[in-house]
Amino acid sequence: MGLFPKTVEPLRVFEPRYKQMLDDCVLNDSPFGYVATDPEEEDLDGWSPPSKFGVLSLADDLSEQGANLMFTAHGDARFRIIRVIPAALPAQSFGDIFPTVDDLVESYIDANPDGKLYLRAEVEQLPPLVGNIDNSRWVDFIQSWAEFLVIMDSLLRASGLGLKQVLSILQEDFSIYSESGLWTACQSILTEHGERQDALGSQDANQVISILEESINTKKIQMDFFQSMLDNEE
């Protein structure tokens, strides 16, 4: 699904292309572009195409577990893709056993010495959000978020926490508006590809919170419908 600025996500990779990318980033002390796949675009030589907007991310806490690389991605600045640079090799199916990075590089290095196993891109880095969210609007949003979580918890029959408890938990971290808090809310609430891309491409903080408000309202309606169906079955 991708990442938002100022948020973190633990990741596991095992494909040679991602291992090469991480090696390059660590050696050069540079970020990588964390971008969701665009479901509407055609494949690029068999590779899933990237979406328009992504987040420059730093890899931290790298460790090996068997054939897997484990690390934490830290989201930083947003970017817009201008041009995709294709991978040196088309996508291939290797089954359960992947070749090494070195073996794959040997197959293209003579013809394409600057090539990489992973997709790259020319990008435009986007500035931080402009504008500020009124305190009353932010308070209303946190209230709505808490209500949404309580409804979801009730449907899942999970913790059984009430609105007052959930609201208190959210208020500990989100009592005052901050861009960091806004992006954290996006990472938690936005699940649809389109709304996540719209948020990443926004210029103003009020655009982002409008996307969040609409998403929560839509989810509340859906969950109310599911709850009514469950009640009718009982």
Outline where the language-model segments fall.
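N-terminal low-complexity, acidic/polar interaction/targeting segments
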Residues: 1-234
